Amino acid sequence: GTPYLENLVSTTNRKLIKLFDRDDVAIYNSIPTVEGTLMMVIQHTDYTIHGSNVMVLGFGRTGMSVARAFQSLGAHVKVGARRSEHIARITEMMFSPFHMQDIEKEVGNIDIVINTIPHLVVTANVISKMPAHTLVIDLASKPGGTDFRYAEKRGIKALLAPGLPGIVAPKTAGQILANVLSQLLAEDVIARKENGE
């Protein structure tokens, strides 16, 4: 949390729950995020997802969902990761894996790049090796992981799209949080009963 929240929690003897850091919230939120990503790709390209070459950067909760969705629509999906267990899972799920340090070698035939890594990975060097028609969708939290200034200079369309759940499916996004909060409150009631409060 922020220093203000951390201070508030320590001075009031309260518990801070970082909802958006929770695995369950992130996994549920990956559903509207994927739908929003598909919507953006369809809006900003003049070719089908089917048969296109898609590169997903990061294989966390969102990256995995994005890769699966694009593969299920017939895209050829390459996934970049750093951790060996992610490379193994990428391989097991029938995506084409690559190590992030090799991104410059891998991007030469890519139509769509979808970044989920919240630090600069789509650098000027990477962008300079992309085909001119490549679309970059950056799902990482602000400021994203893309050199947007260089992309614009090169004529590559690069879009920063954090917070898609609240934009494309606000009712679902609210329901996800309501469900998790209800679960947390129920767990708290049970814990208090067990502690005799």
Q: What are these model-derived regions, one by one?
A:
Residues L16, V77, P97:
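Hydrophobic anchor at the start of a short beta-strand
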Residues D23-I42:
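A glycine-rich, Thr/Ser-enriched phosphate-binding loop motif common to dinucleotide/cofactor-binding enzymes
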Residues H44-I49:
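Glycine-rich helix-loop-beta junction characteristic of Rossmann-like nucleotide cofactor-binding loops
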Residues L73-M93:
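NAD(P)-binding Rossmann-fold cofactor-contacting core
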